[in-house]
């Protein structure tokens, strides 16, 4: 019971000191001064301290170690220790102060044993206050003397208000504060690094999306430009290629050169006669493997008889100009009343003999004058698929019964005129129907084979008067 009574005043005084903000601030200042004392202890030896300081600090550690002993003869003995022992204790106190900045909390927190229980609690509280004041005064003085710095020592009131328990509490609070300050700083670097990486990744994703959008938005345009460039390059290379790279066709070149001269020799002809005639024969000559012969029908009125004969001959001659061989000439005039089978045989012999001997063109004049049955031989030479000779040209002429042919007559009207004439000549009720004789169906089949191109010829007065002199 006596011990509890003695401890209560001291505990109350400690609680009051803990609750006082000014005391806490003084504890933090004492901690900072203690750290300066550690540096002072390294720079200056404890030997340079004055004797008064040694005596004051000797009381501090001894008071903490003995637990605030009463004023008895033992306290007098403590003051009579040898001087060297006092210096060692001063050094030890500086070392302890450098490590922990304050006296150990265990010794300060424990209640010292009181050898004199007769003292009242108020006397013990007074001695405790004196002890705390002496220990707190020693540290600031040593720090001030050792470092020689311009720091101002704390006041006497603040030193008296501090206690060993509060010094330990201040140290713990400072350590906690440092850990709290360092912890966010240590953790902030990974967080900042992570945020920077996230921002960088987001920026890269945005750039990828922009590139994708840009590609898909401009992709079709780029594709079209590339296709146009390829086509333009192909066309340019095709037209700018040297002439020697194109395979030459001597027959075509000779035909074009000679056919172009006919326009001057036969003036007054329709434009489509030259255009269509050139295109039709040029296509056939340019074909490497023609499937059928080139068959053309020229027609004219009776006033253009000589012009028709001369023009058809020169067109066939232009077609075979590369071979330097004249075309085959067959005339149906004067054979109307001959035997159709005989005429058919003669026509077959002349065409086959000439084509087999290298002639590439044949001119059949007055096709309308042949016996009807004899014209069936042209199935053999003008068939679409099974013609006997496919790389040849057959030029047929039909003289209309009309006296004149208007220049305004077009190709279709000209074709109808020729067709009507042949139907009138080759089909009638008096003609017997047999295999060797013509009928309407056979004539329709023949017409489809020989009527690829029907062109009108206008008379040339000089030719009609003087004949074909060239």
Swiss-Prot record:
Bias type Polar residues, positions: 21-34, 147-170
Residues that bear Phosphoserine:
13, 93, 120, 163
Residues modified as N-acetylalanine are 2
Where it mainly occurs, coarsely classed, is endoplasmic reticulum
Instruction: Outline the segment boundaries, as ranges, of region: Interaction with TOR1A.
Output: 236-470
Task: Recite the UniProt keywords alphabetically.
Answer: Acetylation, Endoplasmic reticulum, Glycoprotein, Membrane, Nucleus, Phosphoprotein, Transmembrane, Transmembrane helix
Q: Which InterPro entries match?
A: LAP1C-like_C_sf, TOIP1/2, TOIP1/2_C, TOIP1/2_N
Give the molecular function GO annotations.
ATPase activator activity; ATPase binding
Where do glycans attach? Answer: 286
GO-annotated biological processes: endoplasmic reticulum organization; membrane organization; positive regulation of ATP-dependent activity; protein localization to nuclear envelope
| Stated name of the protein | Torsin-1A-interacting protein 2
- Name its species: Homo sapiens
């Amino acid at each position: 019971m006596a011990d509890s009574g003695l401890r209560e005043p001291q505990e109350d005084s400690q609680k009051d000191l803990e609750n006082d903000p000014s005391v806490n601030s003084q504890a933090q200042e004492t901690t900072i001064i203690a750290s300066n004392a550690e540096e002072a202890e390294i720079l200056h030896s404890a030997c340079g301290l004055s004797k008064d300081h040694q005596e004051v600090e000797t009381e501090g550690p001894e008071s903490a170690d003995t637990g605030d002993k009463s004023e008895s003869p033992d306290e007098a003995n403590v003051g009579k220790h040898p001087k060297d022992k006092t210096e060692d204790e001063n050094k030890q106190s500086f070392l302890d102060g450098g490590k922990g900045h304050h006296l150990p909390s265990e010794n300060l927190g424990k209640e010292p044993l009181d050898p004199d229980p007769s003292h009242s609690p108020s006397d013990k509280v007074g001695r405790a206050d004196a002890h705390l004041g002496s220990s707190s005064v020693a540290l600031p003085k040593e720090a001030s003397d050792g470092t020689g710095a311009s720091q101002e020592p704390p006041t006497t009131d603040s030193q008296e208000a501090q206690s060993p328990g509060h010094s330990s509490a201040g140290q713990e609070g400072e350590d906690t504060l440092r850990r709290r300050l360092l912890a966010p700083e240590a953790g902030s670097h990974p967080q900042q690094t992570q945020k920077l990486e996230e921002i960088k990744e987001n920026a890269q994703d945005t750039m990828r999306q922009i590139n994708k959008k840009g590609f898909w938005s401009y992709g079709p345009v780029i594709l079209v430009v590339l296709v146009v460039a390829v086509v333009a390059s192909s066309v340019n290379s095709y037209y700018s290629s040297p002439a020697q790279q194109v395979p030459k066709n001597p027959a075509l070149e000779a035909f074009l050169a000679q056919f172009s001269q006919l326009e001057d020799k036969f003036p007054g002809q329709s434009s489509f006669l030259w255009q269509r005639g050139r295109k039709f024969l040029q296509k056939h000559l340019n074909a490497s493997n023609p499937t059928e012969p080139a068959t053309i029908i020229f027609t004219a009125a009776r006033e253009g008889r000589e012009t028709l004969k001369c023009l058809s001959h020169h067109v066939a001659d232009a077609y075979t100009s590369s071979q330097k061989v004249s075309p085959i000439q067959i005339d149906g005039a004067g054979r109307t009343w001959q035997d159709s089978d005989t005429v058919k045989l003669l026509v077959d012999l002349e065409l086959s003999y000439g084509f087999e001997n290298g002639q590439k063109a044949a001119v059949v004049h007055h096709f309308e004058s042949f016996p009807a049955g004899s014209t069936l031989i042209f199935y053999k030479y003008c068939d679409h698929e099974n013609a006997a000779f496919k790389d040849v040209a057959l030029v047929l002429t039909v003289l209309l019964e009309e006296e004149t042919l208007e220049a305004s007559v077009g190709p279709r009207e000209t074709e109808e005129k020729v067709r009507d004439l042949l139907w009138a000549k080759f089909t009638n009720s008096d003609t017997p129907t047999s295999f060797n004789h013509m009928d309407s169906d056979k004539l329709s089949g023949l017409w489809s084979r020989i009527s690829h191109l029907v062109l009108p010829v206008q008379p040339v007065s000089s030719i009609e008067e003087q004949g074909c002199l060239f």
